[in-house]
Regions:
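Short, Lys/Arg-enriched N-terminal segments with co-localized hydrophobic residues
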Residues: 1-13
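NTP/phosphate- and nucleic-acid-binding module
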Residues: 10-583
Length: 583
């Protein structure tokens, strides 16, 4: 049903190439996107949204909200963008959130090392520092700017560092993702949800990554927008209530076992063990539904499973939604089963219980594992801090403690403890339930990449006619209706203005345009993706057709005569998927 719903505007063919420079030129000229700080020469990887860009971006977010808040019943929060160091120490970003960097020994220009060898390796981001250095020599890779030799590869942390407060106060970072704000608020959200699972939470907002050498326009930005979803589920129940409704939907997958695209049903992917579980599969499919609804071409959309050596060590499974662009296949969304990693880490580093109490039907005797601190060893070693450290140890996850060491955070200082200071013991207790650390299913959407992908796949330029059309989905188009008087006289302009004002007040984004020929006005609207144009002519004011106007469909160029008083109703039906030919 989804593909039929949007087939009326997906009229471009895959054979038409798009020059990103032409598209970005249109975006700049018509107010979608502008380079930030352009009067000062601009800054790589930074862009501002113009009036039409803001409208398109907001419409994308509202469609996303309608699915996750409307259909799924998830809740939304808005958390801080500046976080203290402790948050990202626990999450692993302080130690691990880095890209590999190399500098030209001649001109000192910095480059992301793995990007320089993309033409030689399928997944260059998994190469080690040593392997990258060897690849430069093996393939004769030189500085793209001056041709000089490249220096040794190193790690470069991508977080923007700051101080919270004046002077050398508490260290903080601009968040590299919105997700951590949800994780650290888990207990608040859990109580809000009356201590029940599943618990779905969404957040949209800005994130920051100090990219080494951002290129490819909006594909890689230093300040970017995310739409993230964190679904907390019972680790022993990874089904989903609406799974049966979508299990027979087909989807294009690229499993890591074959690395070949194959179409199959969602249920087939789960039953064959290709997708780890039903809840993950459901939200892979939800991502497909969202992207198709936003206007992504199904023929240029696939879901690629992370290879074993690129998957995060804590992830049970991870899939990227990739779209085919002029740059090649590009990731715009990641859907992962993150296991209990996030809550376990924050529980361990903060000393806060972040579990879920799962009640049994009846109390039972069972063996449970607990972490027990060795107080006699902690006292001499840590003195006044020993009591606090012992409490943090005993709040740790037994599974993590079994690794032989745990890290706790004391007054902002990370303290690593080996198992000489604790032991994992098994005790028998009569319990009415058990505490489990929820697992997290995370669909993380790159809003700016989705924005750009929609525009590129919608872009259609006819060089012969010098005519550009953006075939945007009506639901996300920044302007829904262009309202034109045939002439700006004889009352046509007054009639058209009243129609325009009625549409605007009814929540249908419209523009009034009375200048130039009708053909030029259509062209202006087609160029920014406006799906419908309404014209008031002399027949609207007199004769048998009095009170009617013409409405034009952007993609088919078909025109129909309709009652002026029903234009708003008709446009709403069209935006909901009605066939223009049948109105």
């Amino acid at each position: 049903m989804t593909s039929m719903f949007f087939s009326h505007f997906l009229v471009r063919t895959m054979s038409k190439d798009v020059d990103p420079a032409d598209l970005m030129g249109l975006c700049k000229r018509r107010g979608f996107i502008w380079p930030s700080f352009e009067v000062y020469g601009g800054v790589a990887g930074m862009y501002d949204y113009g009036p039409l860009g803001c409208a398109l971006k907001n419409n994308i977010v509202e469609v996303w909200r309608s699915i996750y808040k409307g259909r799924e019943g998830f809740v939304e929060i808005d958390s801080e963008t500046v976080n203290p160091r402790e948050v990202f120490k626990a999450s692993g970003h302080v130690d691990e959130f880095a890209d590999k960097i190399t500098y030209c020994t001649k001109c000192q220009a910095p480059f992301r090392a793995d990007h320089l060898v993309k033409e030689f390796y399928e997944n260059p981001d998994i190469l080690s520092l040593k392997e990258l250095d060897e690849a430069f020599v093996k393939h004769g890779v030189k500085c793209p700017e001056c041709g000089g030799d490249l220096g040794p590869t190193d790690e470069f942390n991508l977080m923007f560092k700051t101080n919270i407060g004046p002077g050398s106060s508490r260290v903080g970072y601009l968040r590299p993702e919105t997700a951590q704000g949800i994780f650290v608020n888990y207990n608040n959200l859990y109580r809000y949800n009356r201590e029940k699972l599943p618990l779905g939470v969404i957040q949209t907002g800005r994130s920051y990554r100090n990219e080494i050498a951002p290129r490819q326009g909006m594909i890689r930005m230093r300040e970017f927008n995310q739409m993230e979803v964190e679904l907390f589920v019972d680790p022993e129940d990874k089904g989903w209530v609406r799974y049966d409704a979508i299990k027979d939907e087909k989807i294009t997958l690229v499993p890591n076992t074959t690395e070949q695209a194959v179409e199959m049903t969602i249920d087939e992917a789960v039953n064959k063990g290709i997708i780890a579980n039903k809840v993950l599969a459901y939200f892979v499919n939800t991502t497909k539904q969202l992207l198709l609804r936003l206007g992504i071409d199904s023929a240029r959309l696939r879901f690629r499973q992370h290879l074993e050596d690129e998957m995060a060590h804590y992830a049970a499974d991870c899939w990227d939604a990739e779209v085919l662009l002029s740059y090649g296949w590009m990731e715009i969304t990641g859907i992962a089963d993150r296991g209990c990693w996030d809550l376990s880490r924050h529980a361990q580093f903060s000393g806060t219980d972040m579990s879920h109490f799962k009640k049994f039907d009846e109390p039972v005797e069972m063996e449970v594992d607990k972490v027990k601190a060795k107080h006699k060893l902690l006292g001499p070693k840590f003195k006044a801090k020993a009591k606090d450290i012992a409490a943090l140890i005993e709040a740790a996850d037994p599974e993590m403690a079994r690794s032989g060491k745990i890290t706790v955070d004391v007054d902002g200082e990370a303290v690593e403890l080996t198992d000489e200071f604790y032991e994992v013991v098994r005790v028998t207790e009569k319990v009415s339930g058990k505490r489990v650390i929820p697992h997290v299913i995370e669909p993380s959407h790159g809003l700016d990449r989705i924005f750009y992908s929609i525009l590129e796949q919608a872009y259609d330029y006819d060089e012969k006619e010098d005519y550009t059309v953006l075939h945007l989905a009506p639901e996300v188009a920044p302007i829904k209706v262009g309202v034109f008087p045939l002439m700006e006289k004889d009352g046509l302009d007054t009639y058209a203005m009243e129609l325009y004002e009625g549409l605007q007040s009814g929540g249908i984004a419209s523009v009034y345009d009375g200048s130039g020929t009708i053909g030029k006005r259509y062209a202006r609207m087609d160029e920014v993706g406006t799906p419908y144009c309404v014209t008031v002519d002399y027949e609207s004011l007199e004769g048998d057709l009095r009170g009617t106007v013409t409405i034009r469909d952007r993609d088919s160029k078909e025109q129909k005569r309709v009652p002026a008083e029903k234009v708003g109703e008709i446009v709403r039906k069209l935006m909901s998927g009605a066939d223009f030919a049948k109105i």
